[in-house]
Amino acid sequence: MAAGEVLRPAFLETLSLVAGDGNLRTDPADCWPYGYDNSRRHVPAQAVVFATGHAQVLGVVRLCTRHGVALTARGRGTGTCGGSVPLRGGVVLSLERMDRILEIQPADRLMVVETGATNQAVQDAAARHGFFWPPDPSSAAYCTVGGNLAFNSAGPRAVKYGTPRENTLGLRAVTGAGEELRTGVRTSKGVVGLDLTRLLIGSEGMLAIITEATLKLTPRAPCKRTLRAIYADVDAAARAVISIMAQPVIPCALEFMDDAAIDMIRVYSQADLPEHAGALLMIEVDGDDDYIDHAADALARAAKVDGLIAIERARDETQVAALWATRKALSPALRNVAPGKINEDVVVPVSRLAELVNGLRSLSSTHGIGIVNFGHAGNGNIHVNLLLDPRDSSQVRAAERCLDEVFGLVLALGGTLSGEHGVGLSKRDFVARELDPVALRLMRDIKRTFDPNGILNPGKGWPDEFNPPGGN
């Protein structure tokens, strides 16, 4: 069917049978909320199916591929790159009702879940057995495991514990061709065949729809220490990050904020910050009781570089909350200042962090666009926020030019365009600047193998010329 074409009554009748009673919506008012995500992009879906199990997903995919109808999987819509926006209309398949914890095996250190379960529900279930699942995006209370897997979204703990790719043992999925697929193992070792688990994680719903995941659990550390270090400028903070990451003790969080972020927090919150703060690091370490203070001392020593203004160590949970309040105040402040901001999540080698942030400051001045930078410094993963009024066409054009140069700077520093937000719609036209033609051709071939009719999340991930036809 052509993009925007109304779904035929016969198709909708069959779709209703496959979905089951109460699981299909076609009224435009009901479908409207399922046409957007946190990127603020919106394209209306023509139908929304609320899947309640793997069999329904299989039936919906087979029906859509038989009729050439675009199909976009969706969790809770917390993504920031338009990845769950149904660009070509068709059907949105919501997995939010597939939220069961199917199995927990402490001895095997694994948990099997449906992918509509929220990250927080997984953490709560694991905690009852003394474990956790390391990925911890800031939207953990709302985002789903399926979304975490689709974009390989991690969070602060990734610096020590890794991303979903390192913390997922296996998957159950349905390919775009309507074939059922199980990948991976239930063991800590396994090398039979190609690693399709890691291929599907981060594929943004373009190859298959993941219905179940076998998650690798990690024991919860009994103790944690939190430090906040404040520096005169970004260069000093970057030197501290390099110093911290070059010594043996690995922090479980190493978060960065630049002077623009600090100034914003100072205006919009009651956080206690020195007047001349030019950059800030939040440093956290976890471990056993007989190790934790030694580890915190080692990180504090590494953080003491020229340009350090002050370093504080929390002595109890109240002080921990007070130190983290600085970081948590940033997102509300950004929403107050620039509700139309562009939010990117670039990554550079840790050793190039100062060059990145100084380069961003230069681009901000050149284009007259405010830029606020913060993020996961231990990975070199910085959230670059371009502040603009979307109603001002001159600001929009300036921001577009600035963003183009931001991506150029990142690639010149040996970085990548996205660490955890994904490509989706927002970065698809830049992908060919990072990936070479051979890689793109192989990816297109893989897409055709998994999704020969091109129905799954069409128009995403890479420029249109690299997308196979179909899903219209």
Stretch-by-stretch model annotation:
Residues 64, 205, 384, 451:
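Conserved, mostly hydrophobic/aromatic
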Residues 25-28, 32-34, 215-219, 225-402, ...:
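C-terminal substrate-recognition/cap domain of FAD-linked oxidoreductases
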Residues 1-36, 67-69, 302-320, 412-417, ...:
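N-terminal accessory segments
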Residues 376, 416-423, 458-461:
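Short acidic/histidine-rich active-site segments
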Residues 1-62, 79-109, 138, 261-270, ...:
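N-terminal flexible segment immediately upstream of the FAD-binding catalytic core
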Residues 179, 428-472:
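Activity-critical C-terminal alpha-helical subdomain
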Residues 100-104, 110-255, 456, 472:
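FAD-binding subdomain of flavoenzyme oxidoreductases
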Residues 106-109, 391, 425-432:
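Short beta-alpha connecting loops at secondary-structure transitions
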